[in-house]
């Protein structure tokens, strides 16, 4: 997608008369943004639009492996990052809400914490380290359906704008905000846009944060530069970044297989290393205040335990064992079978099972990457935009 195109204008399907004035997402989701999320939202999608979304996403992955991937294939994926990312979230947002909740990210776990409380505390921690305060104007890069934005707005009293490339997510984020009483006020709002071409004036925001979202950028330096431009001088940018760690060896076939597996079902055009991320944020003009892999700690429970199938060992409550079951290997195997049946009889759109299988492949790669210390979803960076010298 060129920077001049609207994110939802690129995809075209044959228009029926009753959908001529609708965007692709409106045709695809058919008002399901008003549902409660998860499985109920998967029902009733437009079949033709669903096939288009599946085709546009999986054309970058079908028939490709870590062994056969070429530089040309990776560059093509990077060039098509906008469609790749948008269609990925058209396909997986309902799955994420069903299996994970409204905050699409991992977290660290303190002793005795439930899954939900750990997710919230992790969001509050980032807000605290950035120094977000009441009345500040803050940008959430890659806001998803708004879970973190709502929590940070409550925690700090800041005015938060969330941006995501996916229109369906914007609609869901607005609905959840309204359900919590935010309405159309200034404290919490959501817009659709491409973070590689942010639609805001220069020096608009007092602070910016991103939680596991800028990994979708084709080049980290470029998205960090966009953030630098909209941040006020002296403002702080803090993020949790998905990266391959210093232990990753590009020449090791096993390492490359894990990286490719994470990219495949993660909607990621080009997963980078921690050192690349550090260099990128500095090249964008920021003063790096701190960087830390939060996965490299002595937490009782590793960040990947909800995916690993051993919840009985780490979960703090029986409720967490039940709520995370769908994400475990056993839960994913059941989903493979059930979705195959319901898709064959037309209850869910074409490609639903394929999408679930892709997410399962990536879950296995995430666990392997975490256990072997090759990957982290929580590389914390906190950086300041310098104040111009007089």
From Swiss-Prot:
Start and end residues of each stretch annotated as Disordered: 1-21
Any GO BP: ergosterol biosynthetic process
Bridged cysteine pairs (disulfide): none
Compositional bias ranges of the Polar residues kind: 1-12
Pathway membership, UniProt: Steroid metabolism; ergosterol biosynthesis; ergosterol from zymosterol: step 1/5
Record's keyword annotation contains Zinc-finger: no
Annotated GO MF terms: sterol 24-C-methyltransferase activity
Pfam families: Methyltransf_11, Sterol_MT_C
Keyword vocabulary terms for this entry: Lipid biosynthesis, Lipid metabolism, Methyltransferase, S-adenosyl-L-methionine, Steroid biosynthesis, Steroid metabolism, Sterol biosynthesis, Sterol metabolism, Transferase
Alphabetical list of InterPro entries matching this protein: Erg6_SMT_methyltransf (IPR050447), Methyltransf_11 (IPR013216), MeTrfase_SMT (IPR030384), SAM-dependent_MTases_sf (IPR029063), Sterol_MeTrfase_C (IPR013705)
Catalytic activity: zymosterol + S-adenosyl-L-methionine = fecosterol + S-adenosyl-L-homocysteine + H(+)
Known EC number: 2.1.1.41
Family to which the UniProt record says this protein belongs: Belongs to the class I-like SAM-binding methyltransferase superfamily. Erg6/SMT family.
Protein name: Sterol 24-C-methyltransferase
The organism of origin for this protein: Pyricularia oryzae (strain 70-15 / ATCC MYA-4617 / FGSC 8958) (Rice blast fungus)
